[in-house]
Amino acid sequence: MFISISAGIVTFLLTLVGIPAFIQFYRKAQITGQQMHEDVKQHQAKAGTPTMGGLIFLIAAVVVSFLVALFSKQLTNNVGMILFILVLYGLVGFLDDFLKVFRKINEGLNPKQKLALQLLGGVIFYLFYERGGDMLSIFGYQVHLGIFYIVFALFWLVGFSNAVNLTDGIDGLASISVVISLSAYGVIAYVQGQMDILLVILAMIGGLLGFFVFNHKPAKVFMGDVGSLALGGMLAAISMALHQEWTLLIIGIVYVFETTSVMMQVSYFKLTGGKRIFRMTPVHHHFELGGLSGKGNPWSEWKVDFFFWGVGLLASLLTLAILYLR
């Protein structure tokens, strides 16, 4: 446990030092920062803010986790595959960000390219991950999926990778939401005695807390797709490694809600010929524009943040209660 906590502290400090250096490099190189294409007026002031900051906490967490796991003899298959997902999905996000920032391609990777790379990572994860069978745990009941587990694994990894990406829309929202989710999985890993997984979890929590120092409103840096896609994939991989896949639907309720709001909005818009359910999606923008109802006073980013963090915290506590207070 001490080793895992130490890994988190080291990652926190590395990120705390690395982000200012990254921002300084960004400015000196006169790199065009984040482009704003949203209809939220208060976001226009963020144009030009350095992005791709997720690269710093991602490298710090992966390197520290690998080295500490190696020297403490905890470099298990679980650790290897979680780090693999972090690296591969991080690379997908990096390529997407690179095209947007350096090649001035607003779309970055097109949806088909991004999906293909994410699916490739998922297939490799499934082929090399020794999870001890193709059983899916649902509220304590084991369901044998056989070959269909790969379909679930791909859906889980790609779905939550993109869900966290959608959540990363206002200052600090995604970083602390993921800290809350990872903390819940840290408890589960500890109770199960899986200290190898706990090591990776605490290392990433340290990195995210260090990043948040510069990402809270007003953000000095954004994580970019390199950070958000990797974090979503990590959460999905951890839920599978712990054989508690179903828990991510509750622990990750914020990401589920964000994604569902987009799907509902698009479907309703097409069915009704232009009508909307929400003012704007992902749904955190709806609250920004008009509160819970969408017709009231606009919420500040801090208010939206605390609302979603509160929902995520309650959902995580509920999940732990379901698991351990039965």
Curated annotation (Swiss-Prot):
It catalyses: UDP-N-acetyl-alpha-D-muramoyl-L-alanyl-gamma-D-glutamyl-L-lysyl-D-alanyl-D-alanine + di-trans,octa-cis-undecaprenyl phosphate = Mur2Ac(oyl-L-Ala-gamma-D-Glu-L-Lys-D-Ala-D-Ala)-di-trans,octa-cis-undecaprenyl diphosphate + UMP. Its main location: membrane. Its cofactor is Mg(2+). One of its GO terms (biological process) is peptidoglycan biosynthetic process. The keyword NAD does not apply. Keywords: Cell cycle, Cell division, Cell membrane, Cell shape, Cell wall biogenesis/degradation, Magnesium, Membrane, Metal-binding, Peptidoglycan synthesis, Transferase, Transmembrane, Transmembrane helix. It comes from the Bacteria. The keyword Flavoprotein does not apply. Its EC number is 2.7.8.13. The chain crosses the membrane at residues 3-23, 51-71, 79-99, 115-135, 138-158, 169-189, 195-215, 221-243, 304-324. Disulfide bonds: none annotated. GO terms for molecular function: metal ion binding; phospho-N-acetylmuramoyl-pentapeptide-transferase activity. It is found in: Cell membrane. PANTHER family: PHOSPHO-N-ACETYLMURAMOYL-PENTAPEPTIDE-TRANSFERASE (PTHR22926), PHOSPHO-N-ACETYLMURAMOYL-PENTAPEPTIDE-TRANSFERASE HOMOLOG (PTHR22926:SF5). Belongs to the glycosyltransferase 4 family. MraY subfamily. Catalyzes the initial step of the lipid cycle reactions in the biosynthesis of the cell wall peptidoglycan: transfers peptidoglycan precursor phospho-MurNAc-pentapeptide from UDP-MurNAc-pentapeptide onto the lipid carrier undecaprenyl phosphate, yielding undecaprenyl-pyrophosphoryl-MurNAc-pentapeptide, known as lipid I. This is Phospho-N-acetylmuramoyl-pentapeptide-transferase.
